[in-house]
Each structure stands twice: as structure tokens, then as C-alpha cells.
Amino acid sequence: MSELTLTQANEQYVHEISASRHEPQWLRDFRLKSLNLFSKLPAELSYLYTKYADLAGIELKSTSLHLPEPSQAQTQDVLSKLRSDRAITIYQIESKTILPDIPDALRKEGIIFTDIRTAIEHDPELFRRYFLEKAILPEDDKFGALNNALFTTGFYLYVPKSIEVTLPFRHVTVLDSEGSGLFAQNLVIADNRSKFTILEELYSTRLTGQTGRSTYSGLSEVHLREGADVTYASINNLASNVNVFSNKKSIGARDSRIEWSSGLLGGAYTRSRVESVMKEEGASSENVEVVFGAGTQRFDTVSNMSQIGPNTSGHAVSKGVVKDKARLLVKGMIRITKNAKNSRAYLAEHGMILGKEARADAIPGLEIETNEVKATHSASVAQVNDEQLFYLMSRGLSEDEAKRLIIVGFFEPLVARVPVADVAKRIRRIIDLKWSGVYDFAACLKTPAFEDEYYEEGHKTQDIFEGHYKYR
């Protein structure tokens, strides 16, 4: 296959992708439709957010659609740092995919965890069914359409009925090459009453010093059948030259539950969309999002909840801190339809600004079509509290140390709610290193022993923002 840039991603290139992978005609047609929509759709579909859409400097045009093969030394170095015996892991290192060793006991239960290409080849009819009933349609989002057209990596996970898996399923992506694009699509099927955890980790081993812009595009769908319970934790610590486009969406059947948690810490420009659709009665969703921007980083995040069935519940909280010249835009919408009687929803968006050149905006929204529901939302953007700063400095701390403690205290009530301990530890570590101006891949993976002891002791935190809301 010839090496192409994103501006050359045309119908011929899509045909080349499909032909090289021996894909069925319906998937090729789906890719072509998606590519056509990408060229036509605006960056922002909602009139509420159109004026905030800002893609200046994204530089997608020069992105190469050819991922290099990593060297053996690079592969071994990554594996030595990221290998874990406490998870079932797929590694995506540049263009190289390393599949997991699934324990025999789980394999006999019918669990499937493999890369998306292998899954499509083995069971094309299954994928035809889900692609024709996709959660994230090409027409829903410009960059979702681009992913649907160009994806070449990703994972497929199926957990059968009534199976509870204690080991997490882990997907680790490492993107180091300059000017390259990696497009991953993930499909998760949680059958009736299944329960499991997914860890999605994005890293660059060289966090600074690169100039050529790279692109990471990830699209994840979680289909929850009756009574299914899924935890999906993700962390983004990609390099300062990577543009990140992330779309995640779940469809929840009766009494299902999903818990999202995201640490958005890396990248040059990050555009993140998380949506939970509670389609049937009793479905529930929780979404926790932590953002820390420094330098010239830009973050544009969305947390949406669509409650269609009665007696559903949704809870989404996002917190972000920006320093230097960083920018943060946090958006979210609660939609409760006319049939969603007795439903409950809460949406909170809070930003903290450090410095005169940083900027943050929070835009929560409500669309409610019925009575007998409870929907609350809160939003705040502020500088560091001068009284808190003065108090800490009067106790002997420097201004820098005092601000660091205030930031830790701002984030911790939310980080403490991240359901996967290893992810929570890594988020804390990266926040601390970013505050100190240290950008070292190996250091990000290590947690000082005293921090482990402190949090394992179960110190309680209180979120002072939880009481501030608008009520309906």
C-alpha cells in the first residue's frame, strides 16, 4: 500500500485498505460513506457550541497514513516498562499488534479479546450486525466519520452471559513516530449480567521535543445487554505533538451499568466525546473526567447523557486545571426524553485557571421532555483562591508549593472516584510531574511508596463544589 497523507485519503485509499484486509463489500461501502461525510460535516454540529469550535493549528493535512514498524529494541523497551501480570493486555506499538495470552479458563467460557482486524476476518456477519446498528454513526460527528473511514487498529471484546472477570482487559497504545496517524476502533459487547473492566492507555515514550504533528483517533462503542456492568477507564499521556480525537459511546439495556473514567493529560490538541445512552428501564451511567493542561495544550471535551428508559440515572463530573497558555472547553448535555419518568441526572463542570494567559470555559445544558424527574447541573471557572493560598503560605509553604497542594485538593475528590486503582495512581503521578515541568515517560509510570501508603490508608476527601447546582 502506498504511503499517503491525510489530504490524499480518498476513495482509492479506502479501497486499498479494504482490499489489503480482505474486507466484505458492506464494510468497504461503509468506509466510503464515512469518508464522504467527513468532507461535508462541520467541525461542530450543535448550534450551542458552533461559536466555540476552533481547529486552528491542528495540521491534519500533513498526517501520514503510514505507521512505521517499531524496531525490536523499541518493542522490548516498551514491553519492559508497561508489561503487567495483573491484566489481559493487547499492545499496539506503532503498527505492531501484540495479542494477549488469554487464560484457558476464560477462553473456555467463550470470552473473545482480540484485535479488530482478526475479529472481522473470523466473524464478518457479527460485525455486519453491529456496524449496521452502530452507536456512533458517521453522520454524528465529523471526526467520528473520519475514524469510521480509516480505522486499521483497535480491539474487539465479547464477554458471555453471567461471566464476571476480575482481571481487567487492557489495551495499550504507543505512538512515537512524527507525522503519523493511528486510527483505532474498539467494539465491546457485554452480554446479560456480565461484569468486567477495560483499561485503555495511550502513551508516547518521547513526550517532548518532537515537531511533526501526529494524529491519534480512537472510537469506542460499548453495547450493554440486560444487567451488564462495565467499567471503562482510560488515560491519555501522548506527546506534545499529537492531536487526539476520541469518541466513546455506550448503549445500555435494562438494569445495565457503565462507569467511565478519563485522565486527559497529554497531547497537543485533545477533542474528547463521551456519551451514555440509557435506552431501557433501570440503566445507569457514571462519568469521571480529569483534565490538566500546560504549555499550549488545548482540550475540548463533551460529556453527554441521554436517558430514554424510565427509572434511569446518570452522573457526570469533569474537572480541569489549565496553566501557562493552555485552553480548556468543557461541555455537556443531559437529555431526558418523554418516556424517562422517575429518572435522575447530575452534570458538573469545574475549571481552575493558573495564570493570566490560560483560559477555561464550562457549558452545561439540560433538555428535559417530561415531568417527574430530577436533573441538576453545576459549573464554575475560577482562579486559585487567594485566601487558601495566603493560609498555606502563612504556614511556611512557598507560593509554588501552596498552589500545588490546592490543585491536588481540587482534583483528589474526583481522582479518588476512579474505579481502577492503577489508573488513579498514574493520573496523580502525571499531574504532579506536569506541575513540576517534568516530562519523562519512565517517571510517569512510577509512584513514590509514600503516596501508595497514603491513599491505601483510605484518607477521605470532600468535594466543596458538590453543593453548588441548579435544580429542576
Where are the model-predicted features located?
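N-terminal amphipathic, basic helical "cap/leader" segment at the start of enzyme domains
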Residues: 1-140, 144-145, 295, 323, ...
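Conserved beta-strand/loop scaffold segments within soluble protein domains that form the structured core
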Residues: 20, 105, 109-390, 394-397, ...
